[in-house]
A protein has these predicted regions:
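Transmembrane helical bundles and short interhelical boundary loops of multi-pass, membrane-embedded
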Residues: 2-3, 22-25
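Beta-propeller blade termini and top-face loops
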Residues: 25-586
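Hydrophobic membrane-insertion alpha-helices, especially the h-region
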Residues: 9-20
């Protein structure tokens, strides 16, 4: 495969499906791929418009209209309790429409320690799912939601006694979690770890049953049977990132302004490893930092640790081959328009790193796409980067992985699971070939929905385009994508269901007359001072556009009749005609 390797030493804008970074892979022997443009939704090369603006839109949904302040987690919990106590209507039933073939933003994946065929996955707003066949088919874990657990899943781990832990909450979204939940029977029943609330990360080792938690109250640990969590004395503030070695010896975490701390004695003591790169330390004051620890020890009998620092783009990457004692920066800042553009203005939204299990000197980094770094020089450590996935090719291409990667997990046979805004992707050959694994994994985030008179449904989704289901595909819940990017509000004509209206960022509005097979854009009449629709970041065009298809005249309606006058009338005369059906006048 002739891929280019980069060697490095010590609401609404035009849709995002374009071919950035495609050139280096077009030279490969994988075949020739067309860019996944979906016609009118092609853009100028940017993958997405919107992690920050999508979050801003979501936060606006959680503002109290009376106070103007964001609704607190405590208030949301109170509201949920009130709703749960309301009497249910006995006359209303719901049927799930799907999609069962398209996923959504996935922050957490966990492979069962006792059975690698069983895999759990969690969406940031879709709840918990389980697969019993390595991700081929997923089923919702209803018992998790029925227990009162929060559907906003941030992280998962499983201790050696088989207890599964699911963390809820986020440091970015407007919603918080309602604690860390655990199951001792593979998801059949659930309980809450005492006194937990918003938790962004949980990890565990292969040597004991402690679960370590990154929380707003610092680093905590707990095991089944403990009356309360134990606070781990690192420093004050929020624990923002956390990883642990399989043998439990090494714990690396970040606090506050992402200051790095390392423990080499299983969490008994921590050392501050923040400082300048020139002093072989990890700089702090990064908006986001992610860590990874090697599964095995390196040739010097130490663990290899990695740190990836980002703002909107890459700030730096660092490696330590001596259990975190000293660190070497092996790449510095990079971002658009550079070809080496891992995060593409979204470094605080999508960032993840993992060490290849059998090679402490090789990592995979997830941003918009997935990249590999392999160390080729020992002193100082340096090597080359290689892009191993592309979001912009057709989904059946062997190099396709959906954009915006958030999670990476390996099973004991080195089968690799990636969680992203499109759901779950899998590789069994270290990233040389990929396939999507979303059947039944319905965690898609919808901005708006529409339906027609025959029962077909359509919806605009976060980073999964505009989707349409007229129940004619292989399953009742299978959708097809009729538009790209972030789909927003949409409409289907009642009079002619072949007519559809869809929207994407910044007032881009489109019409289809053939059920979404082809589209044409149209623009409303605007003042001359307005930017053209689709203008990136325009103050005149909001990220999210709301539309309403006004179909007031229905020639088939029975609520009006034609009347033939039998005499002359003057303008303004009142005419009363008794209704033959009820005696009421019309």
């Amino acid at each position: 495969m002739n891929k280019k390797i980069y060697l490095i030493g010590s609401l609404i804008v035009a849709a995002v499906i374009a071919g950035v970074g495609l050139n280096e892979l077009r030279k490969s022997n994988l075949g020739s791929y067309e860019e996944n443009t979906l016609g009118l939704f092609a853009s100028n090369g940017k993958e997405t418009k919107g992690a920050d603006e999508a979050l801003a839109w979501l936060k606006a949904r959680y503002v109290d209209v009376q106070t103007g302040q964001q609704v607190t987690d405590a208030k949301l919990i109170e509201i949920r309790k009130r709703v749960a106590q309301m009497e249910r209507s006995k006359n209303i039933t719901f049927t799930e429409e799907g999609p069962d073939n398209i996923g959504g933003r996935t922050r957490a994946i966990q492979i069962d320690r006792t059975n690698i065929n069983r895999v759990w996955a969690g969406g940031v707003s879709g709840g918990l799912f389980v697969s019993l066949n390595k991700g081929n088919i997923w089923n919702r874990v209803d018992e998790y939601f029925n227990a009162g657990a929060n559907p906003f899943i941030s992280s998962m781990t499983q201790t050696i006694d088989g207890v599964l832990y699911v963390a809820t909450g986020s440091n970015q979204e407007p919603w918080g979690g309602n604690g860390v939940w655990y199951s001792t029977d593979f998801g059949a029943t659930w309980d809450n770890v005492p006194n937990t609330n918003n938790c962004t990360q949980v990890v565990s080792s292969d040597v004991d049953n402690y679960v370590w938690m990154a929380t707003t109250g610092g680093l905590k640990k707990w095991k089944l049977g403990d009356a309360a969590m134990t606070s781990v004395p690192v420093t004050a503030g929020t624990c923002t990132a956390l990883e642990i070695s399989k043998d439990g010896e090494i714990i690396v975490c970040a606090f506050g302004a992402n200051t790095t701390f390392v423990s080499t004695d299983g969490g008994a003591n921590f050392s501050n490893k923040s400082g300048t790169a020139a002093n072989n330390l990890v700089p702090s004051n990064a908006p986001r930092i992610e860590f990874a620890v090697s599964a095995i020890k390196n040739s010097s009998n130490h663990h290899s640790l990695y740190a990836v620092r980002t703002n909107s783009n890459l700030l730096s990457m660092h490696v330590s081959h001596d259990d975190g004692a000293t660190w070497t920066q092996f790449v510095g800042a990079s971002g658009p328009p550079s070809e080496f553009d891992i995060f593409r203005d979204q470094g605080t939204y999508n960032s993840i790193v993992t060490v290849v299990p059998n090679d402490p000197e090789q990592i995979l980094i997830g941003g918009i796409d997935i990249w590999r770094w392999k160390q080729t020089v020992n002193n100082p450590p340096s090597g080359g980067f290689q892009k191993i996935s592309l979001w912009s090719v057709p989904q059946n291409a062997s190099i396709y992985v959906h954009a915006d990667n958030h999670e990476m997990k390996w099973d004991s046979n080195n089968r690799f699971y990636a969680g992203n805004d499109g759901g779950v992707s899998i590789t069994t050959d270290y990233g040389n070939t990929w396939f999507v694994a979303n059947r039944g994994y319905n965690v898609t985030q919808f901005y708006g929905i529409a339906f027609d008179r025959d029962g077909a449904v359509m919806g605009g989704t976060q980073d999964n385009g505009t989707l349409y289901n007229n129940h004619t595909l292989s399953t009742y819940q299978e959708f097809r994508q009729v538009g790209g990017g972030d789909g927003f509000e949409c409409e289907i004509s009642y009079f002619n269901p072949a007519v559809m209206i869809s929207t994407i960022y910044y007032n881009n509005i489109s019409r289809s007359g053939d059920k979404g097979n082809t589209w044409s854009t149209f623009e409303p009449l605007l003042p001359g001072s307005y930017d053209p629709p689709g203008t990136d970041g325009s103050p005149f065009h909001p990220f999210h556009t709301e539309v309403f298809l006004a179909e007031y005249f229905d020639p088939n309606s029975e609520d009006s009749v034609n009347y033939i006058a039998t005499k002359n009338y003057n303008s303004g005369d009142l005419i009363r005609i008794p209704s033959l059906s009820s005696g009421d006048s019309i």
